[in-house]
Curated annotation (Swiss-Prot):
GO CC annotations on file: host cell cytoplasm
Name of the protein described by the UniProt record: Phosphoprotein
Natural source organism: Infectious hematopoietic necrosis virus (strain Oregon69)
Free-text function comment from the UniProt entry: Essential component of the RNA polymerase transcription and replication complex. Binds the viral ribonucleocapsid and positions the L polymerase on the template.
TM segment ranges: none
Entry keyword set: Host cytoplasm, Phosphoprotein, Viral RNA replication
Region of interest (Disordered), ranges: 21-62
Family as reported in the entry's similarity comment: Belongs to the novirhabdovirus protein P family.
Biased composition (Basic and acidic residues): 39-61
Main location: host cell
Subcellular location field: Host cytoplasm
Pfam families recorded: Rhabdo_M1
Kinase found in the keyword field: no
Length: 230
């Protein structure tokens, strides 16, 4: 070091000497002498933040769940082969499941149709029995109403005419038989209105051919008629 350089090195101002002495008396813990305030300000200047690098797009974006799963455990070079094998396996499983499901549905449908047919047949039989029971109840009710009716059931006019005709025929034949046993009786006397009326009354009173009371009434009427004719 030359004399000129030494003079320049020790050519310090008073403030610099005082600051240097203060630093020497109170050294820093790290053993370094404090820097110039200008340098410290420069050191404290905010540093520029490093530029954020743009994130690379996810290479799994747009892939199916199966492809993402395969890429997670299989190398990318073998991904296509693995994807093809797994796809075929899944297709076989799906096809087998579909066939099993179809068979099950067909079995259930067959059982359902059989149960429906049995139910329909049972319902038809039930309706038939119900109709028979209903008819029997209606018949029983009708018989009870007829037998226990407070008002007598009126006779059918045709039945009345038939009964009168039957009674008249029986009574008329009986009168003729009686007249045949009495001498002096002509067919005109046997066919008189009085004898006809008597025969009808006897028939209405249920006195038919062979009844002693009926014969007696007929004979008395004939005798009365004969006396009136004398």
């Amino acid at each position: 070091m030359s004399d000129g350089e030494g003079e320049q090195f020790f050519n310090l101002e008073g403030e610099d000497i005082l600051r240097l002495e203060s630093r020497l008396k109170n050294p820093r813990n790290d053993g370094q002498i404090g820097k110039n305030p200008r340098q410290r300000k420069e050191d404290q200047a905010p540093q520029e933040e490093p530029k954020k690098t743009t994130r690379r797009p996810d290479k799994n974006k747009g892939l199916s769940q199966l492809e993402q799963l395969i890429l997670k455990y299989v190398e990318e070079e073998s991904c296509q082969d693995a994807l093809k094998d797994f796809g075929g396996l899944i297709a076989n499983i799906r096809q087998a499941h579909q066939a099993e499901l179809t068979s099950h549905l067909e079995k259930v449908a067959t059982e359902h149709r059989a149960n429906l047919q049995a139910l329909t047949k049972s319902q038809q039989e039930h309706e038939k029995v119900s109709k028979e029971i209903l008819s029997a109840v209606i018949a029983i009710r009708s018989n009870l109403n007829e037998n226990h009716s407070p008002r007598p059931k009126p006779l059918d006019p045709d039945q009345v005419k038939a009964a009168r005709a039957l009674g008249f025929g029986i009574g008329y034949r009986t009168a003729l038989n009686v007249f045949d046993r009495i001498k002096g009786v002509t067919p005109d006397n046997a066919g008189s209105q009085e004898v006809k009326n008597m025969a009808i009354r006897a028939a209405e009173e249920d006195e038919y051919e062979g009844s002693p009371t009926f014969f007696r009434k007929v004979i008395d009427a004939v005798k009365k008629r004969m006396k009136q004719g004398q």
